[in-house]
């Protein structure tokens, strides 16, 4: 019996770490992402912050910078040119989505209960990230608030539906929170937390600095696993108590 209790104590110490590791430094299962993160030399421009540990390839980082990204068969110019600052924020958001290895706590299957392709859901972007993105795009034009669904595919590429005219971003996204959360169908969540709080992710950071999102992913990975461990380990403990 003493040996079993020693094993249990070891599980209490080790299981949270082992389980948490599954949510840290991982890539989602998709056609564009690598199977696992690792160094990538010469990522293109806005994707450079992830060169030390990336889920994207150099080719993907280059495609993220095209006016009509091959990644999504979609033109950011569907209502004319975005302002340079607005376009830069979108490229940074694409790089973050494609390259970051710190999105594990928010990875979910595209199809409920499915085991194949995955997406991220509700990634908490820092307040400044949403505000800066919104200000940069305030005067640019778009015809939709959700860029993932509801497009006209009659010409094999996404075009504005006939009944949805081009209007300023401020019409479709009255607040920074609206932009962050609606634009990619809840891929991102507008966090009330600010940068360096350890409770929100930055969609971009200076390539010369360490990745601030590692600490944040660690925090949320622990939070996500706490409910599971709170049932599993006590249940095992009870079994030992009644073990003859």
UniProtKB/Swiss-Prot annotation:
Any GO BP annotation: sperm-egg recognition
Pfam families xrefs: Folate_rec (PF03024)
**Processing and modification events after translation:** The protein is rapidly cleaved following fertilization, being only weakly detectable in zona-intact fertilized eggs at telophase II and undetectable at the pronuclear stage. Sheding is probably required to block to polyspermy and ensuring egg fusion with a single sperm.
Q: List the disulfide bonds.
A: 27-55, 47-95, 56-99, 79-166, 86-137, 126-200, 130-180, 143-160
Q: Which residues are glycosylated?
A: 73, 185
The record gives the effect of mutating residue 62 to A as:
Impaired ability to promote sperm-egg interaction due to reduced interaction with IZUMO1
Q: How does it sit in the membrane?
A: Lipid-anchor; GPI-anchor
- GO MF: signaling receptor activity; signaling receptor binding
Task: Give the miscellaneous note.
Answer: Was named 'Juno' after the Roman goddess of fertility and marriage.
Functional summary from the UniProt entry: Receptor for IZUMO1 present at the cell surface of oocytes (oolemma), which is essential for species-specific gamete recognition and fertilization. The IZUMO1:IZUMO1R/JUNO interaction is a necessary adhesion event between sperm and egg that is required for fertilization but is not sufficient for cell fusion. The ligand-receptor interaction probably does not act as a membrane 'fusogen'. Does not bind folate.
What name does the UniProt record give this protein? Sperm-egg fusion protein Juno
Instruction: Report the gene name.
Output: Izumo1r
